[in-house]
Curated annotation (Swiss-Prot):
HAMAP family: HemL_aminotrans_3. It holds the Pfam family Aminotran_3. One of its GO terms (biological process) is protoporphyrinogen IX biosynthetic process. It comes from Aeromonas salmonicida (strain A449). Its EC number is 5.4.3.8. InterPro entries: 4pyrrol_synth_GluAld_NH2Trfase, Aminotrans_3, Aminotrans_3_PPA_site, PyrdxlP-dep_Trfase, PyrdxlP-dep_Trfase_major, PyrdxlP-dep_Trfase_small. The modification N6-(pyridoxal phosphate)lysine is found at residue 265. Keywords: Cytoplasm, Isomerase, Porphyrin biosynthesis, Pyridoxal phosphate. This is Glutamate-1-semialdehyde 2,1-aminomutase. Pathway: Porphyrin-containing compound metabolism; protoporphyrin-IX biosynthesis; 5-aminolevulinate from L-glutamyl-tRNA(Glu): step 2/2. Belongs to the class-III pyridoxal-phosphate-dependent aminotransferase family. HemL subfamily. One of its GO terms (molecular function) is glutamate-1-semialdehyde 2,1-aminomutase activity. Transmembrane segments: none annotated.
């Protein structure tokens, strides 16, 4: 029995399911999750001493790779001063200014402790600002585990939302309308029926929780137009895409001007932190300047701010995103070519430092319902073949993959050689 096996068994005695976030349990692929001992550069190292080329990157924030020396030094320096004060600090001011400098739509910024806090707070602010209750989200998009967001579509196209988790009251869910990602007609229909009651649209500009699905041309622009027409706010959930698909995130990549933006752990270089921000006229409605309440004892934590500020400074170096885009394209196109060589149907999506692959005959994947039709059993087999080869992919067919700037020729060549052997076994 491996040490990971032992730890998983031990963990299940005191931690529900043996993990502190469900996807880590390997329910989507079967088997025992690998317990990680440490990470460096493009690699994870498990408790049994196995090294893996990492394509999760803590679900996105490790853009510079693990254990970056400059970020580590900044964290150590901050820790030597203290861990938490419960009072304002200079570094949180510098961090907010840096975010505003890079992402101009975020005229004012409020730090929080997670992506879930960011989206939950942004939605509360949108409701308070507009005086409306309903929100629009999209099937297959994930915005954290707040009650109003754990909602699925009802049985009809325009029925009110239904809870998709026990513990979410139906009275909460009824205020959430679920539309089809990349389908403006479904959004227009929702606004035609409920437009005067809708406070906001919240959307992942690149959907990263139905694998990786970029917006079709005109989709994000159409959402902006609809929001303007009906007086609703547009919230871009950039927890995954922020500073990843471009320096200015997806809003910079696609040239979209949102009212509010949410960010996650990438602004802490992987530490537990988040933020939301947007137009000053909207952000002024947040306490203490406005009536919409939001607070957090650990918000603006100085250690997380030190890590994040250092990372954002490093990302300003010219040419980094061109390098990242080229690395991602090389991996994605290499996977596609290796699958084709062995007659394995595979569709590939990628943008910036994100990618996704789908075992399907459909040449283009643009909607959630297409993802649900993919060959999940083949994905599970491929996942474990790659894991045995020392390549750590997301353990779910519904999660995106991420590259870092630490992925070099050696790591990419190893990955594609492993994929070649794995596809050969799948075809055999």
């Amino acid at each position: 029995m491996s040490k990971s096996d032992q730890l998983f068994e031990q963990a299940r005695q005191t931690i529900p399911g043996g993990v502190n976030s469900p996807v880590r349990a390997f329910n989507g692929v079967g088997g025992t999750p690998r317990f990680i001992d440490h990470a460096d550069g493009a690699y994870l190292y498990d408790v049994d001493g196995q090294a893996y080329v990492d394509y999760i990157g803590s679900w996105g924030p490790m853009l510079l790779g693990h254990n970056h020396p400059a970020i580590k030094a900044a964290v150590i320096k901050a820790v030597e001063k203290g861990l938490s004060y419960g009072a304002p600090t200079e570094i949180e001011v510098l961090m907010a200014e840096k975010v505003r400098q890079i992402v101009p739509s975020m005229e004012q910024v409020r730090m929080v402790n997670s992506g879930t806090e960011a989206t939950m707070s942004a939605i509360r602010l949108a409701r308070g600002y507009t005086g409306r209750d309903k929100i629009v989200k999209f099937e297959g998009c994930y915005h954290g585990h707040a009650d109003s967001l754990l909602v699925k579509a009802g049985s009809g196209a325009l029925t009110l939302g239904q809870p998709n988790s026990p513990g979410v009251p139906a009275d909460f869910a009824k205020h959430t309308l679920t539309c089809v990602f990349n389908d403006l007609d479904s959004v227009r229909e929702a606004f035609t029926q409920y437009g005067c009651d809708i406070a906001c649209i919240i959307v992942e500009p690149v959907a990263g929780n139905m694998n990786c699905i970029p917006p079709v041309p005109g989709f994000l622009e159409g959402l902006r137009t609809i929001c303007d027409e009906f007086g609703a706010l547009l919230i871009l959930d950039e927890v995954m895409t922020g500073f990843r698909v471009s320096l200015r995130g997806a809003q910079g990549y696609y040239n979209i001007d949102p009212d509010l933006t949410t960010l996650g752990k990438i602004i802490g270089a992987g530490m537990p932190v988040g933020a939301f921000g947007g137009k000053k006229k909207v952000m002024q409605h947040i306490a203490p300047t406005g009536p919409v309440y939001q607070a957090g004892t650990l918000s603006g934590n100085p250690v997380a701010m030190a890590a994040g500020l250092t990372m954002l400074d490093l990302l300003l170096e010219p040419g980094l995103y061109e390098q990242l885009n080229a690395k991602t394209a090389r991996v994605a196109e290499g996977l596609k070519a290796a699958a084709a060589k062995h007659g394995i149907p595979l569709a590939i999506n990628y943008v910036g430092g994100m990618f996704g692959f789908f075992f399907t005959d459909e040449p283009e994947i643009t909607r959630y319902e297409q993802v649900t039709r993919c060959d999940m059993e083949r994905f599970k087999r491929f996942y474990h073949l790659m894991l045995e080869e020392g390549v750590y992919l997301a353990p779910s067919a519904y999660e995106a993959g991420f590259l870092s700037l630490a992925h070099g020729d050696k790591e990419i060549e190893h990955t594609l050689a492993a994929a070649e052997r794995s596809f050969a076994k799948l075809a055999g």
